[in-house]
């Protein structure tokens, strides 16, 4: 639904204790211009509900809750800086 593939953070990753690293972005998805390979996703928010992304399993479980057209916010790290991007689910 988001057009991205993720993996668990490497054990030696110091910038965040939990989250996932983006390994691939589908160029045709709504995420394509907002999420980059190498980004770390730590949280996803839908409405007033915020979900912590602990690993790739929790990421997939969270994403499965959304339907096409839902508006969400992705919280993460890029190059050591925090970011928040709004995305409409594909």
Residue ranges and their predicted role:
Residues 1-90:
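C-terminal recognition in membrane/secretory proteostasis and scaffolding
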């Amino acid at each position: 639904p988001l057009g991205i593939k993720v993996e668990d953070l490497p054990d030696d990753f110091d910038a965040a204790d939990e989250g996932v690293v983006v390994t691939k972005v589908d160029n045709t998805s709504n995420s394509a211009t907002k999420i980059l390979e190498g980004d770390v996703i730590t949280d996803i928010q839908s409405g007033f509900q915020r979900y912590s992304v602990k690993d790739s399993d929790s990421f997939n479980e969270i994403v499965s809750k959304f339907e096409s057209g839902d508006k969400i916010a992705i919280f993460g790290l890029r190059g050591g800086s925090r970011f928040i991007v709004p995305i409409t689910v594909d």
